[in-house]
C-alpha cells in the first residue's frame, strides 16, 4: 500500500509540472499554489488504520520512503528532461528564453505538514507585501523569484536626519479699523449725547413734540449750515404753545360762556364784600381799588375803640364766650391755690418794688370810661438776659384788673380772673401764674445769679437728679443744660466703694471742652463786658417814656432802638415808642483798701521779702535741678507741658526760664508746688490766656467760632512772648480746647 501511495503522488507531481510548463506567465504563483494544494491533499487522502499497530506502520512507512527516495529523484529528473523537449517543440517563443524554466523552478521535495504550513504563512506574507505600495521596512528574499518580482519595486527610506517641523506662519498684522469701537462710553457720548438729552427732557416734560421742537430750533440757531430736513421732507419747527393772539381768543371764548352782568350788579357785590367805602368807583379805577385792597389786607388788625361804653363792652363780653388758653409753661408752673392766699402780698410788693429799682413801674394806661379810679393795675415783667424782641401786645404789661362791677357780680359764669383781649379782639381768660417768678423781688431776697467760671461742660453720675440740670430762664440766660445724665448703669460693687472717675462719662454737649483740667483755671477768656460786670445788669424792652423817668445811675448803656421785629409779629405804629436798655440790677461791690492804707509797713515788708526770695531763688533752683536725675527732669518737662530737650543743661535752662516768667506773671503762686518745677501746667494756661487777650482781633475770631490755624496761633503768641517756642504743641492744643478755641491744621 505504501508503494502504491508513493506512485500515485509521483504521478500527481508529474502532471503538475506539465501544467506549470505550459503556463509560463503565472509560473511563480500557480506552481506554488499547486504544490501547496498537493501537499495539503496528502493528509486528508491518507487512510490510516485504527488498529493498535499504528506505531509499527509509521516506522515501516519511514523505512519504505527512505528506500524509494533515490528512485523518485531519478524519475523526476527524467520527466523534467522530457518536458523540456516537449516545450521546445511546441512553443517556438521559448527559444529566446532558454533559462527561464530551469533557473526559476525548484526541486519539489516532499516535506512534513508542519513545515509546509509555516512555508504557506511566509508566502502569504510576501504576497501581501508585494501588494503594498509603501511599507516601513524593506525585506530581503533569498529566492530568485522574489528578487526578480521585487526588482521594479523601490523601497522608500526615511532620511537619517529629520527635518525640523516648520513653525506655523503668523498672519501679517493688519491695521486696526478706525470704525471699531474701543470704548463704548466715549462712543455713546460722542454720538448720542444730544439724543440722550432729548430723551431725558422727554421723560421730565409733558409734551415730547414741544421739547423736540425746542431742541431742533436751538440746533438750527447754533449751526451755520442749514439744518437737514427730517426724513428729507423739509419739516419745519412747530410748537404746541399758544401765541398772544391765540390766548386772547381763548380768553374771549371763556368769558362768553360766563353769565353777563351789569356794572350795578358788580357794584352791589363789591359793596357787600368790602363795604360802601371801598366799593365806590371800584369799577372805574381798577388799579386804585386793587391798591386799596392790598393795603387793607396788609394792615394789622384794628385796635378796639377806647371810647366804647361800658354797657357795650359788657354786651360784647356776654355774647362772646371766653376762650381759655393755657401754655405748657403755665401748666407746669400752675400754683393757683398759692396765689389766692398770697395775692394781696404780691400786689402790694409789686407796687413798691416795680418803680424804684428795676425801672419797670410803668404808668397805667387809663382807657376812657373803661377803668374806674379805684382799679388796681399790676405791672408784671420778666427778667431776661438775652436780647428778646417780642410782639407789642406781648411786651405790653399785662394788667390785673379788679373792678367793682366784677366784685359785685353774682354771675357764676364770670370769675375774678383777669380778662385780657387778644389780637382777634376776643375776651380771653388768663390763667393765674406763679407770681413769685414774674414779680420783681427786693435786692435782699433775690437769689444770686449762677455764673460759670470755667465755662466747661460738667459731668454727673446717674445718681444725681435730673432737676439739678434744669436752668431757670428767669434767673439765668438761656444756655445748654450742662448737667448730663450718663446712660451707663452704676455697677454694684460688693465692697460698696466706687471711685468717682469710674462713674463719670465725658459727653460733649456744647462747644465747651471735653478735657477737664485737674484744677480750675484762674482766668478764662471773657468779653470786656463780662470782665467788668458779670450778672450786674439785664437787657429789657421798655417804653421810652418809662425809661427816661428811671434813675440815670441804673441805666448803664445808651438806649437801643428796635430795628428788627420778630418774624411772627407785625409792624405797628407803636414800635417807635419802645427801646431796649441795659439796666443795672445790683451795684458792684467796691473793694475796700482800708487794710492796705492802714498798714503800709506790712506791705513794704512783704515786697522786700518777695524781692529777697526772688533774688535767692535762681541759685536754689539751680542746685535743685542739678541734683535731679535726667529721667526726673524729663518727667518734669512732660508734666509741666514743655518741649523735651536732649541735654541736661537745656532742660534746666527751659525750666528756669519758665519759672522766672510765670513767677513774674503770678507772684502769689510761689512755693505752692513741690517737686522739681515750682509751677504747673495750669499756670502756663493762665499765662497763655493773658497773652491772647492782648489781641482784640484774635478774640473776635475766637468768639465767632472761626477755625484758627494752629501755626498762626503759635506765631501770634510767640510775637507777644518768645517763651511760647519752648511750650509743647500738645499743651497749646489742650489749652485751646479748655478755652473753647476752634483750631485747624494748616497744611502748607
Swiss-Prot record:
Residues 76-88, 222-236 have a biased composition (Basic and acidic residues). It comes from the Eukaryota. Residues 62-75, 277-298, 591-602 have a biased composition (Polar residues). One of its GO terms (biological process) is regulation of meiotic DNA double-strand break formation involved in reciprocal meiotic recombination. Phosphorylated by ATR (MEC1) and ATM (TEL1) upon DNA damage. This appears to be required for the function with the RAD1-RAD10 endonuclease. Its main location: nucleus. The modification Phosphoserine is found at residues 289, 329, 355. It is found in: Nucleus; Cytoplasm. CDD domains: SLX4_RIM2 (cd22869). GO terms for molecular function: 5'-flap endonuclease activity. The keyword Phosphoprotein applies. Belongs to the SLX4 family. Forms a heterodimer with SLX1. Interacts with RAD1; catalytic subunit of the RAD1-RAD10 endonuclease. Interacts with RTT107. Regulatory subunit that interacts with and increases the activity of different structure-specific endonucleases. Has several distinct roles in protecting genome stability by resolving diverse forms of deleterious DNA structures. Component of the SLX1-SLX4 structure-specific endonuclease that resolves DNA secondary structures generated during DNA repair and recombination. Has endonuclease activity towards branched DNA substrates, introducing single-strand cuts in duplex DNA close to junctions with ss-DNA. Has a preference for simple Y, 5'-flap and replication fork-like structures. Present with 274 molecules/cell in log phase SD medium. This is Structure-specific endonuclease subunit SLX4. It comes from Saccharomyces cerevisiae (strain ATCC 204508 / S288c).
Amino acid at each position: 500500500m505504501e508503494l502504491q501511495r508513493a506512485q500515485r503522488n509521483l504521478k500527481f507531481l508529474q502532471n503538475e509540472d506539465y501544467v506549470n510548463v505550459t503556463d509560463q506567465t503565472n509560473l511563480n504563483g500557480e506552481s506554488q499554489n499547486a504544490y501547496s494544494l498537493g501537499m495539503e491533499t496528502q493528509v486528508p487522502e491518507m487512510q490510516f488504520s485504527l488498529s493498535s499497530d499504528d506505531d509499527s506502520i509509521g516506522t515501516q512507512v519511514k523505512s519504505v520512503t527512505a528506500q524509494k527516495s533515490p528512485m523518485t529523484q531519478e524519475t523526476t529528473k527524467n520527466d523534467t528532461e522530457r518536458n523540456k523537449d516537449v516545450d521546445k517543440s511546441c512553443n517556438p517563443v521559448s527559444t529566446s528564453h532558454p533559462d527561464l524554466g530551469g533557473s526559476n523552478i525548484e526541486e519539489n521535495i516532499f516535506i512534513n505538514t508542519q513545515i509546509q504550513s509555516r512555508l504557506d504563512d511566509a508566502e502569504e506574507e510576501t504576497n501581501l507585501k508585494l501588494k503594498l505600495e509603501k511599507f516601513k521596512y524593506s525585506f530581503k528574499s533569498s529566492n530568485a523569484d522574489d528578487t526578480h518580482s521585487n526588482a521594479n519595486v523601490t523601497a522608500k527610506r526615511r532620511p537619517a536626519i529629520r527635518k525640523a517641523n516648520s513653525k506655523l506662519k503668523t498672519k501679517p498684522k493688519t491695521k486696526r479699523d478706525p470704525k471699531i469701537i474701543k470704548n463704548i462710553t466715549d462712543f455713546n457720548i460722542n454720538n448720542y449725547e444730544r439724543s440722550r438729552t432729548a430723551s431725558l427732557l422727554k421723560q421730565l416734560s409733558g409734551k415730547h413734540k414741544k421739547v423736540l421742537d425746542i431742541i431742533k430750533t436751538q440746533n438750527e440757531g447754533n449751526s451755520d449750515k442749514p439744518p437737514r430736513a427730517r426724513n428729507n421732507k423739509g419739516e419745519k419747527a412747530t410748537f404746541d404753545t399758544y401765541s398772544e393772539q391765540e390766548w386772547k381768543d381763548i380768553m374771549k371764548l371763556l368769558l362768553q360762556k360766563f353769565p353777563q352782568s351789569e356794572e350795578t350788579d358788580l357794584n352791589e357785590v363789591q359793596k357787600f364784600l368790602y363795604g360802601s367805602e371801598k366799593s365806590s368807583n371800584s369799577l372805574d379805577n381798577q388799579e386804585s381799588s386793587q391798591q386799596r385792597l392790598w393795603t387793607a389786607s396788609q394792615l394789622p388788625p384794628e385796635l378796639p375803640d377806647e371810647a366804647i361804653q361800658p354797657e357795650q363792652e359788657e354786651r360784647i363780653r356776654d355774647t362772646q364766650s371766653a376762650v381759655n388758653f393755657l401754655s405748657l409753661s403755665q401748666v407746669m408752673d400752675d400754683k393757683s391755690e398759692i396765689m389766692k392766699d398770697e395775692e394781696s402780698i404780691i400786689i402790694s410788693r409789686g407796687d413798691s418794688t416795680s418803680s424804684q429799682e428795676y425801672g419797670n413801674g410803668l404808668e397805667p394806661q387809663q382807657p376812657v370810661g373803661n377803668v374806674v379810679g379805684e382799679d388796681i393795675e399790676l405791672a408784671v415783667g420778666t427778667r431776661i438776659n438775652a436780647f428778646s424782641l417780642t410782639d407789642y401786645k406781648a411786651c405790653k404789661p399785662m394788667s390785673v384788673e379788679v373792678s367793682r362791677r366784677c366784685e359785685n357780680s353774682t354771675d357764676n359764669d364770670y370769675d375774678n380772673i383777669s380778662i385780657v383781649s387778644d389780637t382777634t379782639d376776643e375776651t380771653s381768660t388768663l390763667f393765674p401764674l406763679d407770681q413769685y417768678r414774674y414779680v420783681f423781688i427786693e435786692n435782699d431776697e433775690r437769689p444770686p445769679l449762677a455764673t460759670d467760671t470755667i465755662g466747661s461742660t460738667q459731668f454727673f453720675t446717674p445718681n444725681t437728679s435730673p432737676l439739678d440740670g434744669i436752668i431757670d430762664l428767669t434767673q439765668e440766660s438761656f444756655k445748654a443744660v450742662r448737667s448730663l445724665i450718663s446712660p451707663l448703669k452704676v455697677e454694684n460693687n460688693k465692697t460698696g466703694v466706687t471711685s468717682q472717675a469710674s462713674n463719670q462719662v465725658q459727653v460733649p454737649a456744647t462747644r465747651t471742652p471735653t478735657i477737664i483740667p485737674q484744677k480750675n483755671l484762674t482766668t478764662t477768656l471773657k468779653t470786656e463786658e463780662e470782665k467788668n460786670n458779670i450778672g450786674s445788669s439785664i437787657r429789657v424792652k421798655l417804653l421810652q417814656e418809662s425809661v427816661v423817668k428811671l434813675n440815670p445811675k441804673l441805666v448803664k448803656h445808651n438806649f437801643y432802638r428796635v430795628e428788627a421785629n420778630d418774624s411772627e409779629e407785625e409792624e405797628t405804629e407803636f414800635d417807635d415808642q419802645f427801646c431796649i436798655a441795659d439796666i443795672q440790677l445790683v451795684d458792684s461791690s467796691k473793694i475796700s483798701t482800708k487794710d492796705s492804707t492802714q498798714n503800709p509797713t506790712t506791705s513794704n515788708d512783704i515786697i522786700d521779702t518777695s524781692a529777697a526770695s526772688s533774688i535767692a531763688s535762681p541759685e536754689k533752683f539751680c542746685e535743685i535741678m542739678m541734683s535731679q536725675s535726667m529721667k526726673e527732669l524729663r518727667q518734669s518737662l512732660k508734666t509741666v507741658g514743655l518741649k523735651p530737650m536732649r541735654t541736661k543743661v537745656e532742660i534746666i535752662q527751659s525750666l528756669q526760664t519758665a519759672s522766672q516768667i510765670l513767677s513774674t506773671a503770678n507772684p502769689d503762686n510761689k512755693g505752692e508746688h513741690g517737686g522739681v518745677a515750682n509751677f504747673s501746667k495750669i499756670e502756663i494756661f493762665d499765662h497763655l490766656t493773658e497773652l491772647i487777650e492782648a489781641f482784640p482781633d484774635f478774640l473776635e475770631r475766637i468768639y465767632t467760632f472761626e477755625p484758627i490755624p494752629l501755626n498762626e496761633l503759635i506765631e501770634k503768641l510767640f510775637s507777644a512772648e518768645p517763651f511760647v517756642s519752648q511750650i509743647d504743641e500738645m499743651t497749646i492744643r489742650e489749652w485751646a480746647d479748655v478755652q473753647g478755641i476752634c483750631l485747624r491744621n494748616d497744611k502748607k
